[in-house]
Amino acid sequence: MVSSVLRDARRIVVKVGSSLVTNEGRGLDEVAIGEWCRQLAALVRGQGGEPREVIMVSSGAIAEGMKRLGWSSRPGEIHELQAAAAVGQMGLAQMYETKLREQSMGSAQVLLTHADLADRERYLNARSTLLTLLRLGVVPVINENDTVVTDEIKFGDNDTLGALVANLVEADALVILTDQKGLYTADPRRDPQAQFVHEAQAGDAALEAMAGGAGSSIGKGGMITKILAAKRAAGSGASTVIAWGREPDVLLRLARGESIGTLLVAQTQKNQARKQWMVDHLQLRGSVTVDAGAAAKLREDGKSLLPIGMVAVEGDFVRGDVIAVRDPGGTEIARGLANYASAEARLLCRKPSAEFERLLGYAAEPEMVHRDNMVVLGAR
């Protein structure tokens, strides 16, 4: 299964934890980060296969900030943790930029919070930015914006953020690099009978028991959060691999189809998962009616919806809201995320994209709903 899941993945999110990035808190591990960046660059260029799109989610800002500030122990005050994050993020971003530049690869820093992905408009903006960076061949390096959040520092984790990013960009796979070789049936440090888990279904409830539960020593060490992250990633059709981050050429070997670490398989196909999410779980905020030609293009060709094909707009919605697309007879044929608010959409009906800047005062996306953010209902 690993051979097909990772070998065939074209968009991959890689998450690496702070213990690896900072060499157990001793400072940024320049050699390790350089190795991961070398592998990321090789994947983007298609070394040994097809080019991949890769996003790195990296912890380590707080740990690096503590080192730079001369703090030997993690402070308990939130504002001190936030200060450490602000100091450390400078070094973290600089290190990735330097190591990727050594590979002649562009990089971009993106700081996110859970709130950014909970708000539909900010979600859509973040998605558009990341997809543009990937299209440009740039490696986005994402971290949680610890300087402005509170609960995430106290209880959150970048395993969850990695899964949310996988959802956001519709990744094919999530790779979590950790200081453990993968998942065991019990804590191998305490139970000599513990068996290594090579593969399981991401939604298997028994996995959480294997990880020890949230209150166990292993759970506090992070394995439980990785199991939950894999379950979340599976919701959008992405399978997850948990592997030792210091395994030589771990990313390249996974991409070649080698069996390394634990594979947690998503039971839902990526497109099916997105359809279910779009159709069943998001509330409609309005609708647009299109002419017969636009309806045919959506139904038959899966094209994006352009405003020139719209004849009417109903409801009051904002950018990022879910809207229905109706044919001239009023039948709902698709739904998706709106690139324009309802007031703007009314101005754009029957207009070509060349007129958008004159009408709106700014130039934005040429589509009302991009095909990547749309589900054609007849194709369910």
Curated annotation (Swiss-Prot):
Q: Name one GO cellular component term.
A: cytosol
| Spans through the membrane | none
The highest taxon in the source lineage is Bacteria
Q: What is its EC number?
A: 2.7.2.11
Q: Does the keyword Cytoplasm apply?
A: yes
GO BP term, pick one: L-proline biosynthetic process
**What is the main EC category here?**
transferase
The answer to whether UniProt assigns keyword Phosphoprotein to this entry is no
The subcellular location is: Cytoplasm
Q: Which InterPro entries match?
A: AceGlu_kinase-like_sf, Asp/Glu/Uridylate_kinase, G5K_ProB, Glu/AcGlu_kinase, Glu_5kinase, Glu_5kinase/COase_Synthase, Glutamate_5-kinase_CS, PUA
* Binding, substrate: S59, D146, N158
Q: What is its main location?
A: cytoplasm
- Reaction catalysed by this chain? L-glutamate + ATP = L-glutamyl 5-phosphate + ADP
| Family stated for the protein in its record | Belongs to the glutamate 5-kinase family.
Describe its function. Answer: Catalyzes the transfer of a phosphate group to glutamate to form L-glutamate 5-phosphate.
State the protein's name.
Glutamate 5-kinase
- What is the source species? Acidovorax sp. (strain JS42)
Q: Name the lineage.
A: Bacteria, Pseudomonadati, Pseudomonadota, Betaproteobacteria, Burkholderiales
User: Which gene codes for it?
Assistant: proB
